[in-house]
Amino acid sequence: MEYRSLTLDDFLSRFQLLRPQINRETLNHRQAAVLIPIVRRPQPGLLLTQRSIHLRKHAGQVAFPGGAVDDTDTSVIAAALREAEEEVAIPPSAVEVIGVLPPVDSVTGYQVTPVVGIIPPDLPYSASEDEVSAVFEMPLAQALHLGRYHPLDIYRRGDSHRVWLSWYEQYFVWGMTAGIIRELALQIGVKP
């Protein structure tokens, strides 16, 4: 499937036709959620952030807005929306949630649920200086091109773990973020 000119309607119809299969087991992991913000344009974009270099975990890494589910959150979707508002000032009311991808286990012990949402193209992003050093948009068609991601096998504590690596402009996209983007591509039927 060729994605040089992926429209939002193409993306939505593929996503809705191929509903993700969710595994409800939490395996006693702490819960977290990220928002996968798809920017509503004729050629949609994928909104990403670069985390502040001053953070204790994942400093300087490219990421989706998101974080741990807290006691005030009614669901993982609510957590993703809250975190997106805190990190880049996306109002929850501006997000049209279209679904979730299967949860991903992080190396830090969280089970992270990716929440897919459509956002308007004219939102004035405002990065939280404590958490985010940059906000940028990548064309969705480029992000979903599986050939841009390269595998790296890491051995940690006796286990093999595959991570994916890619560049977009000056941004190094890798790890969980690259893995989630690849999962989104596979979910809508992109062939490896």
Curated annotation (Swiss-Prot):
Cofactor: Mn(2+); Mg(2+)
This protein's record includes keyword Nuclease: no
Alphabetical UniProt keywords: Hydrolase, Magnesium, Manganese, Metal-binding
Motif annotated as Nudix box, chain positions: 67-89
Residue ranges annotated for the Nudix hydrolase domain, each copy included: 29-160
GO molecular function: coenzyme A diphosphatase activity; magnesium ion binding; manganese ion binding
Binding positions for Mg(2+) per the UniProt entry: E83, E87
UniProt KW Magnesium keyword: yes
EC number: 3.6.1.-
GO BP annotations listed: nucleoside diphosphate metabolic process
Family matches, as Pfam families: NUDIX (PF00293)
Sequence similarity: Belongs to the Nudix hydrolase family. PCD1 subfamily.
PANTHER family documented for this protein: MITOCHONDRIAL COENZYME A DIPHOSPHATASE NUDT8, NUDIX HYDROLASE
Biological function: Probably mediates the hydrolysis of some nucleoside diphosphate derivatives.
Designated name of the protein: Uncharacterized Nudix hydrolase NudL
Provenance organism: Escherichia coli O7:K1 (strain IAI39 / ExPEC)
